[in-house]
Amino acid sequence: MRSSALLLSTPVASASRRIVLFFSSGEREKKNHTCTSRTKLSIILIFVLAPIFSFSQDSLKTEFHKIGDSADYITNFSYHQTLTPQQKKKRIWLVAGGNVVAYGATMIGLYSAWYKNYPQTGFHSFNDWPEWKQVDKVGHFYSAYIESRASMELWRWTGIDRKKRIWIGGMSGAFYQTVIEVLDGFSAGWGWSWADFGANILGSGALVAQEFAWNDQRIKLKFSFHNKTYSDPALNQRSDVLFGETASERFIKDYNGQTYWASANLKSFFPKSNLPPWLSLSVGYGAEGLFGGTQNIAKDVNGNITFNRPDIKRYRQWYLAPDIDLSKIKTNSKGLKFFLTFLSAFKFPAPALEFSNGKFKAHAIYF
């Protein structure tokens, strides 16, 4: 797998022992994390462009539909315009053609810039499930969800049937990432990862299931990051090798600083309450002490140990924190609406309760 968060992929162990002959441990790690960065950046790009494309054409309105004789209400987003068949057809061709051209160009560029520079082999798979405390797998889950969310909004703009929009747009994230998984399967330096594939399907499935159940994303997947520095120079040096030296590289690659969240909008679940529509409660997952895929050790091409820190504990972290659903903030500004929608992919900084190593820890502000 290549890690994953944002087409996120994680650093991977090599698919066969002979790969060690081609790359030193540090080189493989850099290569795999480069893959991570290209995936994340591509997801961010898709998420940015999709709302721009749709919001630039139409404004959203909120329609309230009463359920039976009760006071329960559900919120459904639709467009002011009633599209003619010709308008729908034009938009469908525009979105479909844009997807094919943009994604095709991305894949060609990705192959030319990356895969063709490394040895190719027959299609093969490998098991990278034990690596990185599965933070990379959660990253795949998040990436597929965000891609699907962006794609679904594009298809919503076309005015196509609701079910078609949900299925076509909703499963786009899994499709986009699966193509890259296939390319990995033919690359000697990686391999097809069933764990990655499963996480991709589940991420897109989470969006599809919510749309069919609630016609809304009551539980949004989000991402946060805090930069990690250490008092031990050896750990900083190791982090430079694995995750890059700049803050932007660390943001994309450092699993020790990444947290993934499931943020539930409370008003959506309790419509009769007086809760503000933007208030959410989120559960987060992360890990620390990760200076290698499965253990904190690294070797060079000759098998010499270059980093060996079994004393550093590798552990999982769970979080509980309030959150703000920025997409629920009302505004008549298309630009601000887009900006808030984009930011809704990221966790809002807030107090948090952490559970790790069998203990609770409070954070005044966590991101």
What does each model-identified segment do?
Residues 153-159, 208-213, 264-273, 326-331:
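Outer-membrane beta-barrel proteins
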Residues 102-106, 165-185, 201-204:
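Small-polar-interrupted transmembrane alpha-helices in polytopic inner-membrane proteins
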Residues 140-147, 184-211, 319:
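Alpha-helical transmembrane segments that form the membrane-embedded catalytic/substrate-binding core
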Residues 254-260, 277, 313-320:
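Residues that define the transmembrane beta-barrel architecture of outer-membrane proteins
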